[in-house]
């Protein structure tokens, strides 16, 4: 039996590969990340990259020991002689904050805007739109607790999606308050759910003690049935004055900028480090779960990792999920494109010359060459299969004259040009 890729992963393939969707094409990933990079760097964000594996303790302390990520979804790495001391990163925020603290980035002007992209890993059941290895774009801002920073982060996430051409998405905006607000809310939830303990799923029975708010985000059918019967008050009813005023300010900024959003008091973030502003970006056509991504404020994360108090906010979206949404909308996703020039020799003795011409042409354009002599018809067919724009033919006459016979496969234009003027002829 032939060896196949691990379940829940994807090979990123060249353009033109058979039976591939956009999220399986390397060029589509590169295009989407480039669009996000342009939006984020115009806003002052700088790129940061962190290792794909981290100490397990970073994830446990940063993401939270009660989360599904830590309890069920971490990939432990056993190859470093420590038998489990490292894990493949399940998300990017904790790693970025760790890098911020470790490398003295607090000395840079605040707020510091950072972005990254790369693979993340979750040991969960794979399905359409959800994978065990997936690509993520992260945007993080460190060093400011201002509501204006929150609003800008949300606006930038919407701007990235709009630049891609995606319509039909909605920002669902909420707040999970400060730690003391959540303590009051969790006490309320324990009182509410405790009489119904026998109807809760095993996971939610555990959550009732650790973090009752996570019950509201349960996918269990029995939990969903119970939630539908109970009249659960929203977290927004428990916000202290500081968190409530901050939430009103975020809404005011978004409204002033014309950023569309819906208030959603049911927003519950899956990671323990979040506080106050929280949101998700949804699109209904991608299956599994409709969230393309989400974000929120995490002012306490730095202290959990052993650093001082550093306020922060950030968001992330999955590249594969966003590409699925673009395909659902019928949006054309650029491929890598073929060469601008394809050079072929008409006889074997001029194959080295054709190669030399193509190598020189690469100074100004994408150029390929045929590795053997070809008849004109075969050269045109081969160039067309590769997506070339121009075909350049070199025979004995062209070699003697120092010229190239060009044909544009898109327009049919034909001309003979000196090799030294090839760059101008293709411009």
Swiss-Prot record:
Keyword DNA-binding found: no
Catalytic activity: tRNA(His) + L-histidine + ATP = L-histidyl-tRNA(His) + AMP + diphosphate + H(+)
Gene Ontology annotations for the cellular component aspect, listed alphabetically: cytoplasm
Location in the cell: Cytoplasm
One GO molecular-function entry: histidine-tRNA ligase activity
Top-level enzyme category: ligase
One of the protein's GO biological processes: histidyl-tRNA aminoacylation
PANTHER family (UniProt xref): HISTIDINE--TRNA LIGASE, MITOCHONDRIAL-RELATED, HISTIDYL-TRNA SYNTHETASE
Quaternary structure (record): Homodimer.
HAMAP family xrefs: His_tRNA_synth
Protein name: Histidine--tRNA ligase
Natural source organism: Deinococcus radiodurans (strain ATCC 13939 / DSM 20539 / JCM 16871 / CCUG 27074 / LMG 4051 / NBRC 15346 / NCIMB 9279 / VKM B-1422 / R1)
Gene name of the record: hisS
